[in-house]
């Protein structure tokens, strides 16, 4: 899965070369690539059910609730235990254990899991592979007041701050 994820990040649908000049390419991102990568992280189209072609197609899926198996998919990519995933999703261990017996997460839990998957996809794209991305998410970051990026992903503001740091890294700005 990690090789497939890295391939999707680097060469997925939705990325096109701008201009006809020879030499270094200038690439444009149009949204499909990130959606494909997030889908792969969460278990693929088959696991999510329905036809998901772009990010807006995920809204009804998130409202319905992601399959509880998506937690295990993401935990495996990050190298996390279910207890660590419970912490990332701001859930108690007991609540996450109950979800394992159920078919779906709640809409709120699904949204949190989606945010985590989206940040992992972005970090994988910027840093080159899933292992580096997972390590970066767990390591304290000076640009984020010396806290691990993963600890900020339980809020929308935290996610935006982490994505901003990834954007700076991507563009070569010291972070």
Residue ranges and their predicted role:
Residues 3-8, 12-175:
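Non-transmembrane "mature" sequence context
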């Amino acid at each position: 899965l990690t090789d497939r994820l890295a391939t999707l990040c680097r060469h997925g649908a939705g990325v096109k070369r701008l201009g006809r000049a020879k030499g270094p390419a200038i690439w444009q991102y149009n949204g499909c690539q990130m959606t494909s990568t997030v889908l792969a992280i969460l278990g693929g189209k088959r696991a999510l059910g329905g036809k998901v072609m772009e990010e807006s197609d995920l809204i009804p899926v998130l409202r319905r609730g992601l399959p509880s198996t998506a937690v295990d998919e993401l935990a495996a990519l990050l190298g996390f235990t279910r207890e660590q995933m419970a912490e990332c999703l701001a859930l108690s261990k007991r609540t996450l254990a109950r979800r394992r017996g159920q078919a779906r997460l709640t809409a709120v839990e699904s949204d949190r899991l989606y945010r985590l998957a989206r940040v992992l996809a972005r970090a994988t794209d910027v840093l080159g592979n899933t292992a580096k991305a997972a390590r970066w998410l767990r390591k304290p970051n000076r640009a984020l007041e010396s806290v691990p990026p993963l600890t900020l992903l339980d809020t929308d503001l935290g996610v935006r701050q982490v994505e901003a740091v990834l954007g700076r890294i991507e563009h070569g700005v010291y972070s």
